[in-house]
Amino acid sequence: MPTINQLVRNGRKRATKKTTTPALKGAPQKRGVCVRVYTTTPKKPNSALRKVARVRLTTGIEVTAYIPGIGHNLQEHSVVLVRGGRVKDLPGVRYHIVRGTLDTLGVSDRKQGRSKYGTKRPK
């Protein structure tokens, strides 16, 4: 416990919040190029084949990003937009690919929650 005099001299240090998305360098999104598109299995108790992509960002950093939604058109050399947001059951996946921008198509036949999957309004 510091004395009043010590607090007057130095004050309290503010606890700095550690960023969860260091590769974005403080930006909301970053553009990148897919290096490898593949599937992985989630950790216990879940079971699936989750679609992920290894993306080289414009900052030069390579990250693993999750491809949300059912079906996708991504392949090697696709240009994608990457946002923050981890996938809880995939260790090491701390980023999401934004659907409906750049080379990523929106999810087809989607009626609800369309904005999250880059789908246009059905006629």
Curated annotation (Swiss-Prot):
Q: List the disulfide bonds.
A: none
* 3-methylthioaspartic acid found at: 89
Q: Which UniProt keywords are listed?
A: Methylation, Ribonucleoprotein, Ribosomal protein, RNA-binding, rRNA-binding, tRNA-binding
Tell me the GO molecular function terms: rRNA binding; structural constituent of ribosome; tRNA binding
Q: Does the keyword RNA-binding apply?
A: yes
Which Pfam families does the record associate with it?
Ribosom_S12_S23 (PF00164)
Does the keyword field hold Methyltransferase? no
Complexes and interactors? Part of the 30S ribosomal subunit. Contacts proteins S8 and S17. May interact with IF1 in the 30S initiation complex.
Give the protein's recorded name. Answer: Small ribosomal subunit protein uS12
Which species expresses this protein natively? Desulfosudis oleivorans (strain DSM 6200 / JCM 39069 / Hxd3)
Q: What is the lineage of its organism?
A: Bacteria, Pseudomonadati, Thermodesulfobacteriota, Desulfobacteria, Desulfobacterales
